[in-house]
Amino acid sequence: MAAKEVKFGNEARIKMLEGVNILADAVKVTLGPKGRNVVLDKSFGAPTITKDGVSVAREIELEDKFQNMGAQMVKEVASKANDAAGDGTTTATVLAQAIVNEGLKAVAAGMNPMDLKRGIDKAVIAAVAELQVLSQPCADNNAIAQVGTISANSDEKVGRLIAEAMDKVGRDGVITVEDGQGLDDELAVVEGMQFDRGYLSPYFVNKPETGAVELDDPFILLVDKKVSNIREMLPVLEGVAKAGKPLLIVAEDVEGEALATLVVNTMRGIVKVAAVKAPGFGDRRKAMLQDIAMLTSGGTVIEEVGMELEKATLEDLGRAKRIVITKENTTIIDGVGDAALIESRVAQIRQQIEETSSDYDREKLQERVAKLAGGVAVIKVGAATEVEMKEKKARVDDALHATRAAVEEGVVAGGGVALVRVAAKLAGLRGDNEDQNVGIKVALRAMEAPLRQIVINAGEEASVIANAVKNGEGNFGYNAYTEQYGDMLAMGILDPTKVTRSALQFASSIAGLMITTECMITELPKKDTPAMPDMGGMGGMGMM
């Protein structure tokens, strides 16, 4: 086991604080509408330029191991805020730095660290409750656009695009961010259910100009197995041919004789048919086939429960108004499924989202909800260079998370004003003893830090503006972008309540633990063992 280095008390806390400040100082320059960019060197390719707090935090690794422990703990604050709300990472870092700095001063002055932490926790619980009181629902498109604009560093076009996307696919719809082809940002909306499986044979294509298969008013056969024997499908094919409608087959796979026969029938015009593989794998594939069945009012042929493909009739098939199949995707538009049954299916999937602990599963389940409930919107980010593209994509992604958080829990006045108002409301809060009272004051003083940092980044005097905002009431605050005072909500400066709440909770949680630190242990650096000495001239080894 490697030897360890141990530091105690003030010596340990000073080192830890140095690490906290190095990381937080690098992150906090990005806060607010006039926050600056940070350039991150990469081992290959061009450097990355970002204004995203968590991206900056993740890059920082310090040589001094004790300092690094402090930095890593604050990095955890930014990561947690990012996971919970997708935004507010810089605010969380600024709050954590303020609480740690103020708290460690109190510890150095002889206060009990455990009581300080209890006081901080008490203040944060009260502050979260007060934030919920101040919160207003984010109901209309205008408010959604404003939240997106603020989060995307005052880029109004991004805010409007996100609001438009939410309007088109609904609050539960999936909105993804991709690289665009040109210089402008674009919004593409996919109506209906789309999954990433294309046609199994190019001979199914009936629209050569677009390279797609289009089926109008088709039947849909869903099969949870590989189909290779055409005899199994003959009853269904005959029924569809008599009805004079096209057919889409969605199966685990269609191969060999079955695929060849379908292609021949299509080319001869006997029956208009197309086949695609079912989306997903394993249990997820079965679940998605059931989703398609719900959407199209059809059934899935599942051999596990004794159903046979030969016995399938037209009543077992789903219906939709239109289906478009490209090389990569299949889109089912206007399935004829019962709205009440679809809604109950969505509720069931939402319950699974609540219960799952896996981020990957949660993401896949949310995609399924979106496909059933609304649709999919794609924001294509345009930029002149790859470096700008990466930076812009990160901002759009942050803005998207912020707007989702705003829809979920509402909005409060932005620009750090909400926390200042909460701190003023809690001025009379008291703990069980004097040390807890100091902890409460530490937390309340830290709540001013985001406002002060926004003002500092705008090149103004923090104390003057912080006092002016504190003397105001309600949503009165300072717009660092226009350098004017006024009603923050009226000026469109909004923060999602969830983002502000998460930032405060995670910052206080980790900062509270750091204040109560008394000892730090790390591995000593290994001493390099010297190389073997030169053997020199050995006796009797001379040349003859």
Curated annotation (Swiss-Prot):
It is found in: Cytoplasm. GO terms for molecular function: ATP binding; ATP-dependent protein folding chaperone; isomerase activity; unfolded protein binding. ATP binds at T30, L31, G32, P33, K51, D87, G88, T89, T90, T91, G415, D495. Keywords: ATP-binding, Chaperone, Cytoplasm, Isomerase, Nucleotide-binding. Forms a cylinder of 14 subunits composed of two heptameric rings stacked back-to-back. Interacts with the co-chaperonin GroES. Belongs to the chaperonin (HSP60) family. This is Chaperonin GroEL. It comes from Aeromonas salmonicida. The gene is groEL.
